[in-house]
Amino acid sequence: MKMNSKFKPLGYIVYEGPSLLDGSPIVIIINKIKAASKNAKTGALVQSFIIRSDINPVEALKTGADAAICGHCIHRPSLAAYTGAPPCYVNVGRSVLMVYNAYKRGRYVKASPNEVAHYLTGLKLRIGTYGDGAAAPVTIWQQLTQFTADHVGYSHQWLNPSFDHAAWSKLVMASADTIDEAIT
C-alpha cells in the first residue's frame, strides 16, 4: 500500500498478512493516537481495527467472510441468525467501513509494531476495536503493548484448542457468552 503524499497519515498499518483463524488476507490498523474521547467508561483508547484487507467489511459481514477476523464468534451476524444470539454491537457500516476506505485510499502508513509501540508509550490501547486480536500473531500485540500504560481486549478464541493461553492471557480476557463459559 503506497502512502498518499497529499495527506497527513491517519494511523499505522502494523500487520498485513494471513489470518491465523482462516488464512484469508487481513490488516491491522492502529489509529486514534492522541485523540480525545467522549467515552466516559473507557477514556481515551488508541484504536486497533482488524479487518479483511481484500473485502469491504460490510460485504465480509454479509457473506460470512468476517470469519477471518472474528473466528467462530456467535455474535457474527451470519452465525447469530442461526443461533439466536444477539448480533455484534459494532456498526460496521460506519467506523469500520471508514477505516477500510481510508486504508484503500492510502491514508495509513506501514510501520513495524515496535516503531508504533514507541508512539503508544504511556497510552491505552484497545486490542480489537473491531475484530479479534487472535486473528494475527500474538507477537504483534506483545510488541505494541510493551510501553502502553494499559490495554484492553477480549477474545472468543480462548475455547479453540490451538489458542496459546499463556501468551494471550497477558493481553486479552476471555469473551464469555454464558455464565458457564465465564466460570470455565
Region locations from a protein language model:
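Class I S-adenosyl-L-methionine
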Residues: 1-184
